[in-house]
Amino acid sequence: MSAHAAPSPEALSRRAEFKAAKTEMLERFRHAANVASLMHALSKLTDDALKRVWDECGLPATLALVAVGGYGRGELAPYSDVDILVLLPDAHDAALDARIERFIGMAWDLGLEIGSSVRTVAQCIEEASQDVTVQTSLLEARRIVGSTALFERFTVRYHEALDARAFFTAKVLEMRQRHAKFQDTPYSLEPNVKESPGGLRDLQTILWIARAAGFGSSWRELDTRGLITDREARELRRNEGFLKTLRARLHVIAGRRQDMLVFDLQTQAAESFGYQPTQAKRASEQLMRRYYWAAKAVTQLATILIQNIEAQLFPATSGITRVLSADRFVEKQGMLEIVDDGVFERHPDAILEAFLLYETTRGVKGLSARTLRALYNSREIMNNAWRRDPQNRATFMRILQQPEGITHAFRLMNQTSVLGRYLLNFRRIVGQMQHDLYHVYTVDQHILMVLRNIRRFAVAEHAHEYPFCSQLIGNFERPWVLYVAALFHDIAKGRGGDHSTLGMADARRFCREHGIAGDDAALIVWLVQHHLTMSQVAQKQDTSDPEVIKRFAEVVGNERYLTALYLLTVADIRGTSPKVWNTWKGKLLEDLYRITLAVLGGANPDAHSELKSRQEQALALLRLETVPDDAHRALWDQLDVGFFLRHDAADIAWQTRVLYRHVNAETAIVRARPSPIGDALQVLVYVKDRPDLFAGICAYFDRNGLSVLDARVSTTRHGYALDNFIVTQTERDVRYRDIANLVEQQLATRLAETASLPEPSKGRLSRLSRTFPITPRVDLRADERGQYYILSVSANDRPGLLYSIARVLAEHRIGVHAARINTLGERVEDIFLLAGAGLSDNRLQIQLETELLRAIAV
């Protein structure tokens, strides 16, 4: 705000009058929703108010008040900044400064967010030459009041100094840098309607560079100039209108400048457009899908327009480089170009051929504006007959089966909408958001991310990322089978019903239509049906139980199916969100793969033989550590079979080395080390057992910002708890070796205390979880052998959640035998193996479930 004295009664009256007029306009917009009328009306209202203040300040007629930026073009969003320039003559009285300052202060007092500058014409030109942002703002300058002659002199000087080529280069670079800030995708969970790729700023950038080049300042003028077609101009106007309306509604809903379509506002924004929730889709998901389609269209058309403007500003010095396909395609300056605009109409099969050539031709880095435009205008050609054409089906399979370039080809096919035209069910999931707190990409982007992940396994340059996956895919015959499965694994999302079952039918039909038969077709369909199975077994079941492995091996059946499912599962989890995958999940999946492979190879999943094997391996490791030969017996004699099945040989050896001298320790033994699998800390606790032990340990982790990934709890025959935890530090980067000693000391001290369990901290939910809460679920049932009870908990993730659960269990003196903590983005699906007297009592079960639901409630 201005630094001058408090507003006068007259200023307050003007402010109230301005606010009332603006409020009336916003109310009309709420009902009529004509965004162009609103923006122009707000601009005129602001013009009139500033003129009155200008006159009241007695500023001389030799000055000019100029609107710049969006205000300059007469487009004010409800709470946009009002950018103004006070234009001074070259010779001016320094005494004017006080009056200009008073004018700016009074403008602020109107309630406007003023962005002001005071310059001479020469200063404007100098600033513009040094800063493309200033140059852009001045491009749309409009006189509000004051000297017409001075403003015209400024306009002439500005355009004389404007270098259209340099301006084009600077604005395109600026756009690329802006896109990079948004990860080069319009498919953000919370897109910025103005700044994100495919947003309003892209449309403005095109009009700026066109205006600077003298090609026109509206879509109609660019159409007349031949830079776009009449159809493209209509599409641009339609999507621009939607984006402007959406931005204005965000401002009105928020009551302030708000260009980010944040979770908190998505539902209200959707309702303002008339969207209503259905059984299959939230109102917000319907709005977001419309937004993504608009942003996608803007991105496509912007690419075409920028290439066309570039071609006019920078005429090519060389023409055709080489002919790629007779009567169809040439390479022109590294871009694939059709020989004339009628190629796709004469040869519909050339549409997919374009992507095959892009994929397979070295030196071709993209599609030219002419080719992109022809694709954009060929939507009617891509009909049922085109989809059924055997030539097109063969070309599509060739694209899938190339040794390289597949990911880029499919991304480009999606960007140009060709993929959705060829696979109609894929079109249904383009731009479909998944508010499941797990996926952070739209369904189509997730599918392409999974395809990309599988492809990276096969690329030598990326073999270091997941060497085991790269090794497996290197020996996997016909890996394109995996690519087809990736395309269809989530294609039925959002239809209602089981998407795996519905996707199977789509995959089966695709195989039949594309000549995929026998085991390849069977494997593709099976993968779509079971694409969630391996992650569910690895993350939610006790894989130390031979029966679990035996059942999973029966589902898989053979090594090829197991390898295919493993590769798809890793790629799928990694393609949901950068936060979901971690090395611990990778180890769970790899361990499940290896033990299942052994069973498929004839190994008997027998607990006794597995126990003997692990003990022998552990003893060999202990000998390397110079532990006396019989030193392990005192500890091992107190451990049950379950302990040896839940830990691998290296882990058994480490725990034995730590504890063999302390089997009857009077105080807690706590040891911590960086987890052998990386990115985590392994914490061992050995202490006399008590009912609240697990809860007490969880309380310590909660208070110190450590998240539990896995807990393996054992009770010795002589009453000691031997518990192992894998924990991560969630809030910051940390070297686990540096905090290991601190954890050992603090946790041992905590366990020596007799204080009652503290109240759980009710940590704040993320904005995503607050906006899209999931219904918490608790399920308690006996395991198949009746030995333990399995507790399943599903809820929004938040700090203190695990401890809240553990505390309820401790209050009922229920022991936790094992815990599998499965964090999926913003939600958790935790599994606990419980033991305790009375768990078979239905009344206790109901009471326990009720208290747990209360404890995990948001």
Swiss-Prot record:
Belongs to the GlnD family. One of its GO terms (biological process) is regulation of nitrogen utilization. Residues 682-763, 790-858 form the ACT domain. Pfam families: GlnD_UR_UTase, HD, NTP_transf_2. Modifies, by uridylylation and deuridylylation, the PII regulatory proteins (GlnB and homologs), in response to the nitrogen status of the cell that GlnD senses through the glutamine level. Under low glutamine levels, catalyzes the conversion of the PII proteins and UTP to PII-UMP and PPi, while under higher glutamine levels, GlnD hydrolyzes PII-UMP to PII and UMP (deuridylylation). Thus, controls uridylylation state and activity of the PII proteins, and plays an important role in the regulation of nitrogen assimilation and metabolism. Keywords: Hydrolase, Magnesium, Multifunctional enzyme, Nucleotidyltransferase, Repeat, Transferase. The gene is glnD. Its cofactor is Mg(2+). It comes from Burkholderia orbicola (strain AU 1054). Uridylyltransferase (UTase) activity is inhibited by glutamine, while glutamine activates uridylyl-removing (UR) activity. It catalyses: [protein-PII]-L-tyrosine + UTP = [protein-PII]-uridylyl-L-tyrosine + diphosphate; [protein-PII]-uridylyl-L-tyrosine + H2O = [protein-PII]-L-tyrosine + UMP + H(+). GO terms for molecular function: [protein-PII] uridylyltransferase activity; phosphoric diester hydrolase activity. It comes from the Bacteria. This is Bifunctional uridylyltransferase/uridylyl-removing enzyme.
